A protein has these predicted regions:
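Accessory RNA-recognition modules of RNA-modification enzymes
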Residues: 1-223
Length: 223
């Protein structure tokens, strides 16, 4: 009572909007490499490389990484034994810039030069693959090191294998540099709608002092 509720501001096209995807990597019952998402309330991986809210390019990138692992005998991480190398694949996409970052999360503190070179070669080739019909291309290939027995996906340290250590994207007219460890809103279209509505409701005149607490990288106050 005493409140007015407005309808939710939805998306016109609620598909292919998500600019970040994290895929666990494991071993299927038949011994093959599996990439996808965890089944509900489990750590059993359901094979799925094309989620309809994610970028279409992700599936081709995952296919290349899986093939690279198979050809080079690179084992997926096993949570039970703590063995195996590849834990997750993180893919970030610049919604406004079409830049792609691929980050391999590994159970180790280093990877051999031969493996690095072959991975970079395969991934830089896929950025020009005819299967990718957009203007998007890989601008950053990274390693992230996570040797902890934890559910946390990323470790604290990263290494740049090729390209930049970040990709760039915009919210409004502000350009941001986004690393594997950056917190950045995952739905660019709705982010701008949300921030715009918040600014409208705030009704700021320029004479106020506003504290932007717990602001992350400051996207709201900079908008």
């Amino acid at each position: 009572e005493g409140y007015e509720f407005f309808p939710a501001i939805g998306m016109e096209e609620p598909f292919r909007y998500r600019n970040k995807a994290q895929y666990p990597v494991g071993t299927a019952k038949d011994g093959s490499i599996v990439m996808g998402f965890y089944a509900g309330r489990t750590h059993s991986i359901i094979s799925c490389t094309d989620c309809k809210i994610g970028a279409v390019e992700n599936q081709f990138i995952l296919a290349v990484i899986k093939s690279w692992m198979e050809l080079n005998g690179v084992a997926p991480y096993d949570e039970q034994t703590g063995r195996g190398l590849v834990r997750h694949v993180l893919i970030r996409t610049g919604f406004h810039t079409d830049e792609i970052m691929v980050c391999l999360v590994i159970n180790g503190i280093k990877m051999s030069g031969k493996l690095k070179e072959s991975l970079v070669k395969r991934l830089t080739e896929v950025s020009l693959d005819s299967d990718i019909s957009t203007d998007k291309c890989i601008k950053s290939i990274m390693l992230n090191f996570n040797t902890e027995n934890t559910n946390v996906i990323l470790g604290r340290q990263c290494e740049t294998l090729w390209g930049k250590s970040y990709i760039e994207d915009y919210i409004g007219d502000i350009k941001y540099q986004i690393s594997p460890l950056s917190f950045f809103q995952v739905n660019p279209r709705q982010t701008e709608k949300l921030y715009g509505k918040a600014l409208e409701y705030a009704g700021l005149t320029g004479s106020e002092t506003v504290w932007d607490l717990y602001c992350g990288i400051g996207t709201i106050s900079l908008f």
